[in-house]
Amino acid sequence: MLLASREIRRAPVRFGLLAGAIGLLIFLVFFQQTLLSALLNSFTGALQNQSGTVLVFSSEARENVEASVLSPDIVAKVAAVPGVGQAGPLGVATLTFLARGQQVDLAVIGAEPGKPGQPTKLISGRPATAAGEGVASAEAQGLAIGDTVTTAAGRSPVTIVGLTEQSQLSVLPTLFVAYATYMTLRKAANPDATAVLASAVAVIPSSGVSQQAVAASINATVPGVAALTRSEAVANAPGVSSTKGSIAIVLALAVVVVALVTGFFFLILTVQKTASLTLLRAVGAPASYLVRGLFHQVTLVLGVALLIAVGLLLAATATANAGLPLTIEPRALLTSTVVIVGLSLLGVAFSVWRVLRIEPVQAVSRPGLGGIE
């Protein structure tokens, strides 16, 4: 350990550049992972962060909440299924509003006050409980508590009484309102509509009943519907699986590159100092001591690289665009860190093999080491 640490102190530029290069690569992995989380939130954050743990769609909607239509009769049948504790209609639509003199598109989500479907990430203000009140997602730039928005025609005003976070839907900021307000907004946008139907039913199971059991019971009891747990509804939403798959490939390649860069650097370093390592073996240093020194250097370099990566990630998230807020998820970063460190240590396995192959007798068989030719 002493010799390994001394080598780093004698060549700080070499090891510093390596730590910086690996740190940039790890930052790339962390940033892409954070970006993936932000993108998924922008697609389905409003579904993920609402209080209903089971969502019921029309079976013809292919798990797309904006394409789903359910009649009041279906909503009542779902609420009557054994195991359903609470249930309420959920309306979802994209509408154009006037806010501070400018047009803005918002995903409107209507739920009956006190029933499932309420936003769970409220950061300020209060829930919308009365007609004409709304809770806007923080991604709706320029909207603040006390502001009033109207439909594009200047009708049906909605006053913002609260703000929520991580609640976008289909990459649009959201406006949570009471279901009665949702119906009013839909009629104002389409005066010729004869009725406003629910898009889904948000359900909370009875105490002691699992989400999966309630979803299965609804599917077996009510024809023409598809009941999914909240996590299933989020995973099956349009665009989610393709986004996950694309970024997962890039993440995997970046992790492999980090491991290869670390492994190749220490392999080159080991080859360059083979003569010194051979002398150490000749004077009695065990191979295990040299291997421990190698892993000590790798651990120090990776530790510094991780600090650099985390620092860059904090700076990037602090300056992110409000339209796509980046939130660091410690659990995901910890998982990535374990994978990166594990693969990097595996990447230096060839260097370890080189060290273990060094025999003390080579010190007396190499002229360059003072041995006999």
Where are these regions (language model features)?
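Hydrophobic, regular-secondary-structure patches
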Residues: 26-105
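N-terminal Sec/SRP start-transfer signal
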Residues: 1-29, 40, 357, 368-373
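Mechanotransmission and gating elements of multispan inner-membrane complexes involved in transport
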Residues: 163-254
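Membrane interfacial helix motifs at helix-loop boundaries and amphipathic/re-entrant anchors
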Residues: 35-45, 49, 64, 230-250, ...
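Short helix-loop junctions at transmembrane helix boundaries
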Residues: 292-293, 297-345, 349-366, 370
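Hydrophobic alpha-helical transmembrane segments of multi-pass inner-membrane transport and secretion
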Residues: 12-39, 242-278, 299-308
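Hydrophobic secondary-structure segments that place a key small or acidic residue at a functional site
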Residues: 90-93, 99-112, 118-188
